[in-house]
Regions:
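ATP-binding pocket architecture of kinase catalytic cores
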Residues: 43-137
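Conserved NTP-binding catalytic cores of kinases and kinase-like/nucleotidyltransferase enzymes
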Residues: 1-86, 202-205, 315-316
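An alpha-helical support segment within catalytic cores of ATP-dependent transferases
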Residues: 7-18, 136-137, 150-192, 202, ...
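A cross-family kinase active-site recognition segment
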Residues: 111-165, 185-187, 293-296
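ATP/Mg2+ or Mg2+-diphosphate-binding catalytic cores
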Residues: 142, 154-156, 277-316
Length: 316
């Protein structure tokens, strides 16, 4: 989450007047994340998340995201739904942006997960994949494998300001990964960004899965590979924890069957995931406005992960 668009108290109060969820008490911008502007809103009735959708999120995609959340919630998954106003409309306009008032879920994001927490998070993803087998809508992945080469070219040699020689190293890695990229694995609706900060927990129990704005239709096992890259390493990407990695896979498989073919593809899927996040982080590092309330994330943390997956089979 992040804040790019500022909203005045007066505008927010008028926005809330469209709903039956109390009057504004306070609103605080949330700096984490990079995609949209988010506020924690407290009213006389409850707490909510206000999301304003920035340029990277197409308003044409919002029905897919919201329908996916409704489908998951209806099937017992702990996800936040967008709340309709008195007229039954969920997608609003505020401060020149499309916006939604979203359910607030209890729990905290875990910075240093235990194996038990990783198992629970993996199981939560497996349960979502089970539920999404009945979700028919399709959204092409705007950051899928076919976009990575053009994305690197858009970044250009400016990435060398992040680390000397990074462009050439990324190009070599990308050529290798795309040559091996699987094209015949099962495809489904996926979250595609299930980092620890997008999972809320109380103890070892998952209480919320949030931030579905990268959700799309892509290789189902890629979702698990993304999760592995983000959960099983420290924040700098320097240290891999095999107990966490194994617990994620075990938890996932407890709720959704992972085929031998999918399991065998996890190493290449993880290397691809590392390059995807290297590239998007590099772009954000180079292009985030100086006055944006957003925490930039180190692209090189994902290059280190890529190197770890390249050198060893971390799924063995």
């Amino acid at each position: 989450m992040a804040v790019y668009t500022q909203v005045s108290a007066e505008a927010l109060g008028a926005f809330l007047a469209r709903f039956d969820h109390g009057e504004l008490l306070s609103a605080k911008g949330i700096a984490e994340g990079v995609q949209n502007s988010n506020y924690l809103v407290e009213t006389t009735a409850d707490r909510f998340i206000l999301t304003l959708y920035e340029e990277r999120t197409s308003t044409d995609d919002l029905p897919f995201f919201l329908d996916m959340l409704d489908h998951l919630a209806a099937n017992g998954n702990p996800v936040p739904r967008a709340l309709p106003d008195r007229r039954g409309v969920a997608i609003q306009q505020l401060a020149g942006r499309s916006a939604c008032l979203i359910e607030f879920l209890t729990g905290v994001s875990i910075s240093h997960p235990t194996a038990a927490q990783a198992y629970a998070a993996g199981a939560a993803m497996g349960q979502m994949h089970t539920s999404l087998a009945g979700f028919a809508q399709v959204r092409e992945n705007p950051l899928g494998a076919d976009t990575w080469q053009p994305f690197l070219e858009r970044c250009g040699r400016d990435v060398d300001s992040i680390a000397p020689g990074l462009f050439d190293r990324a190009q070599t890695a990308l050529t290798s990964v795309l040559a091996e990229w699987p094209r015949d694995l099962p495809v489904a609706a996926i979250h595609s960004d299930l980092f620890p900060d997008n999972v809320l927990m109380l103890g070892d129990r998952v209480t919320g899965v949030i931030d579905f704005y990268f959700a799309c239709t892509d290789i189902r096992a890629y979702d698990l590979a993304v999760m592995h890259t983000s959960w099983a390493f420290d924040g700098n990407g320097e240290n891999y924890d095999p107990a966490i990695g194994a617990a994620l896979i075990e938890g996932y498989a407890s709720r959704f069957p992972l085929s031998d073919v999918e399991r065998a593809a996890l190493p290449i899927l993880a290397r691809g995931a590392c390059l995807r996040f290297l590239l998007t982080r590099a772009w954000d590092w180079l292009n985030t406005p100086a006055d944006a309330l957003v925490t930039r994330k180190d692209p090189m943390a994902y290059w280190r992960r890529f190197e770890a997956y390249r050198k060893d089979d971390l799924f063995a």
